[in-house]
Every structure is written in structure tokens, then in C-alpha cells.
Amino acid sequence: MKFGYHNHDFEFSESLGGEMLYDIMMKSTDPKLVIQQLDIGNLYNGGANAAEIVKKYPGRFSSIHVKDEIKASEGNEKYESTILGAGIVNTKDVIDMVRKKSKNVHYIIEQESYQGKTPLDCAKEDLAIMKKWGY
């Protein structure tokens, strides 16, 4: 049995003793016992960069909430999710980096904001993008 952890934004925006909470958690957990589910959108809302985190912790992620982000149009969040490839996240590069360093990773396409489109229309667009990228 393994324990799994899904990040939010605070792990990247808050620190303890000058060290980012996410870094503390990663160095304090055994990868054989604790799997990581990286949420790219939450990471960006916390002020981090997905490519940098994936490079820093190769092989540590068993699943990824794949999101692209744009500046939020309303609410308290800095960013909101959008169609893959339409925002500021280098999503394809992040997926490719994880695929090279990790085995059996699950990619969960997640979009929580739709910019006037229906969720189903967005899912169709995201699927088309993933196919275009070769996945």
C-alpha cells in the first residue's frame, strides 16, 4: 500500500525556515511509499513553474493533472484553466519531461474554467490537442 499526495497552491507559495513547503515534503518522504500527483494548475497559482518542479524531482510523479492556465478573469485565483496549448503553461514539454523520467504515469486532463464554452466542447478540444501532440 502507498500513500498518495495531490498538491494545491500553498505548498509552492508558503515556506518554513526559508524553504518552500513542497521541497520540505519531497525531501521528507520516501518515493517507495509516497506517490505524488502533480496538479499543474494549482502549482502555477502558487507561483511555481511546472518544468522546474519536474526537473527538480525526476521520477517522483505517478499522475499529473494536466492543465493550461490563463490569467483569471474573476475570483481570487491568479490563474484559471483553459484549453491545452492556449495558455502560459508549457504543457507538452512538461508531459514529455515526465514521460522520460517516470514509469506508468497517468495523465488527467483537467479544465475547471471554460471561457464561455461547454465542458464537453472543451474536452473535445483538449482531446484533439493531445492527439495532435502525439499522445
Language-model features: where?
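Conserved anion-binding
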Residues: 2-14, 21-22
